[in-house]
């Protein structure tokens, strides 16, 4: 299977459904082999995100994708998980208020994302509150 890097078409097809339900699209991965299209979507909602809601979303999204795409579609929907690696600056906004492990130099430090901003975020530990630039983050993951 070949991974496809531009997922904007998939995003545009599903963003209205997720937005209405207060759900953030964290990540979309697409793979294609001949006439088969595999789509993996990671979604996040801060509260009341049940398995039943995931099942309903799967049905709604699959119907939208099958109506537009010319391939056989295989769809996986999941949540970020408790130890998700934060992969983009945009995710700091999505996970505001969440506890993270952050690596700036060579050590991890635990704290909370208080507020995400355009160029960085406010990180609160037990002893300090500091602005961290996204460009200084080596690794970050939910904790």
Curated annotation (Swiss-Prot):
GO terms for biological process: ribosomal small subunit assembly; translation. It is found in: Cytoplasm. The keyword Signal does not apply. Its main location: cytoplasm. Transmembrane segments: none annotated. Belongs to the RimP family. NCBIfam families: PRK14630.1 (NF011223). Required for maturation of 30S ribosomal subunits. This is Ribosome maturation factor RimP. It comes from Borrelia duttonii (strain Ly). The gene is rimP.
């Amino acid at each position: 299977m070949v991974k496809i890097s531009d997922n904007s078409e998939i995003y545009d097809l599903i963003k209205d459904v997720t937005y209405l339900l207060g759900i953030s699209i964290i990540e979309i991965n697409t793979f294609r082999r001949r006439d088969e299209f595999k789509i993996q979507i990671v979604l996040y909602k801060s509260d009341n995100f049940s398995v039943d809601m995931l099942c309903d979303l799967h049905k709604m999204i699959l119907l939208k994708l099958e109506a537009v795409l010319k391939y056989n579609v295989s769809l996986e929907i999941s949540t970020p998980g408790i130890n998700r690696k934060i992969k983009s600056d945009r995710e700091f906004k999505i996970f505001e208020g969440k506890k993270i492990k952050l690596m700036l130099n060579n050590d991890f430090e635990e704290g909370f994302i208080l507020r995400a901003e355009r160029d960085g975020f406010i990180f609160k530990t037990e002893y300090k509150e500091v602005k961290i630039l996204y460009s200084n983050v080596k690794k970050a993951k939910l904790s």
